[in-house]
């Protein structure tokens, strides 16, 4: 069902992409396209909330941009608070009056996990506040099982999409221009 939603909304894209991690791929999942349609965002959020419910989450935190809407929808179904972390001078921060209490059970959610870098930054940020990060959830896991957050990781769909280091990218070698659809590094 999730893959069909991604295809129907145009969220599953083909081309030459530079991922937030700096790696390259011929496929990209732009979950912002999925969230253009609230009915599909609700389905995805509810399904992820079902997977995370067993962790008794009090607060759901998503990294900007990919986790902002997702954290809100998942939190609504878990009857939890929703926050997002955003970069300030390249460092993840809780801003806009957001806070977590020491010991508060938090879930970190992200639309797509490839290397897990943004999620790991948010986990470290929450630990600095004394939060108890109990799980991570994502719509798409494209990590190939290579990421370890130190807590349970739940995803709605595992996609084995090609990922290349820039120097090994066959699309670069063919001279195909790359686009960077993610949000990291945008001003």
From Swiss-Prot:
SUPFAM superfamilies: PRTase-like. Keywords: Glycosyltransferase, Magnesium, Pyrimidine biosynthesis, Transferase. Orotate binds at residues 114, 142. The keyword Oxidoreductase does not apply. GO terms for biological process: 'de novo' UMP biosynthetic process; pyrimidine nucleobase biosynthetic process. 5-phospho-alpha-D-ribose 1-diphosphate binds at residues 110-118. It holds the Pfam family Pribosyltran. Pathway: Pyrimidine metabolism; UMP biosynthesis via de novo pathway; UMP from orotate: step 1/2. Its EC number is 2.4.2.10. CDD domains: PRTases_typeI (cd06223). Its cofactor is Mg(2+). The keyword Magnesium applies. One of its GO terms (molecular function) is orotate phosphoribosyltransferase activity. It catalyses: orotidine 5'-phosphate + diphosphate = orotate + 5-phospho-alpha-D-ribose 1-diphosphate. Belongs to the purine/pyrimidine phosphoribosyltransferase family. PyrE subfamily. Homodimer. NCBIfam families: pyrE_Therm. PANTHER family: OROTATE PHOSPHORIBOSYLTRANSFERASE (PTHR19278), URIDINE 5'-MONOPHOSPHATE SYNTHASE (PTHR19278:SF9). Catalyzes the transfer of a ribosyl phosphate group from 5-phosphoribose 1-diphosphate to orotate, leading to the formation of orotidine monophosphate (OMP). This is Orotate phosphoribosyltransferase. It comes from Thermotoga petrophila (strain ATCC BAA-488 / DSM 13995 / JCM 10881 / RKU-1). The gene is pyrE.
